[in-house]
Amino acid sequence: MVNANTTQVSYAARATADYAVATYQNAMVDSLRALVKHNTVAKEGVSINDNPAHTAFKAELKKQARALGLDYKDDGYVVVIGLGTQKQRVGIITHGDVQPVNPKKWAKSPFELDITTEPGRLIGRGTEDDKGPISTALYAMKAIKDKSIALNKRIELYIYMAEESDWEPLKAYIKTHELPQTNITIDAEYPVVTAEKGYGTVKLVFNKQEKPTILPYVSEFSGGFFGSQIPEDASATIENANIVLLQRLMRKARSYQGVSFDLELKGSTLTVNALGKSAHSSKPEDGVNAIPYLADLLSSTRWESNGPGTLVNFINDNIGLGLEGKMFGNIAYKDDFMGAMTFSPTVIKQHDKSIELNINLR
């Protein structure tokens, strides 16, 4: 049933959409294949404008835009591909960068469009977030052009190159460029998202210290790959370990659901790996965070405050297995419209003299 106040999609829009699918389905896949092959992950300390992969990706965008008869403008961190010359504009907002990737988790290269591993699916880094929508938008604009649809607004496809890592260049761009009067973001679930969670990061640094002891101690603790991913992997190394500790941890490991542990004792070195389930950090409930679960497995011991051990103790004392930060002081917050703020430890970064825990807030 269609609500009486709902504007129905016009015949011209439906016909043009059907035409785009019938005419350009294969071309859209080829377009996506050409975009996916560029590893547009941000490199720490390297500007997008100095990153060869991003430069090559933008060159591919320019090539595709020109081939489709669309205009192209490169403003550094922002690429604009347009159709029409009208004063009023509608913006289609996307991004060309992608999150880091662990190739070991992929059947094929993440930067090669895989159409065979799961028939009917297009698999590759960025196919959904957000290179697939770019290819779709390009050929939607091409179909409109083919059909000579009379536009009352110019269409502008915006492709930001640092959505996953740095929003400051976008803020600067907005200050110096007049934005379209209407904007649509195709970087979310369909059909419509009315609001998006805010993003914040808490960074905690624990100094590494040499503290000789004959007791078992945590010498390494690691996990996570990127700030906005719920990590499915985490690992810990315990020195001065023994069979008694191994057996105690193995018994406890069997009590968990949704996460598995692999424990291996070689001499007096015990390695513990946790395997949870990855998810986007805006929906931590869809995953199982390996970092706090591994810390929880180790919680029966109060570890030496040497850096990694301090971190394990801190996670157990102040974060736990909850998703809302209720153990982290008074930070927990709930909004009637957006629901509870989520609080997820997502990355542990190793430095020469310290270990850093990044906590993602949404």
Stretches found by the model and what they are:
Residues 62, 135-142, 171, 205, ...:
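Predominant activation on well-ordered alpha-helical scaffold segments within soluble catalytic domains
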Residues 2-94, 99-102, 356-359:
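N-terminal helical capping/dimerization or prosegment-like subdomains
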Residues 119-128, 191, 224, 278-284:
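A short glycine/serine-rich beta->alpha loop
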Residues 130-209, 247, 320-342:
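Acidic/histidine-rich catalytic neighborhood of metal-dependent amide-processing enzymes
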Residues 1-14, 18, 22-23, 30, ...:
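Metal-dependent amide/peptide-bond hydrolase catalytic core
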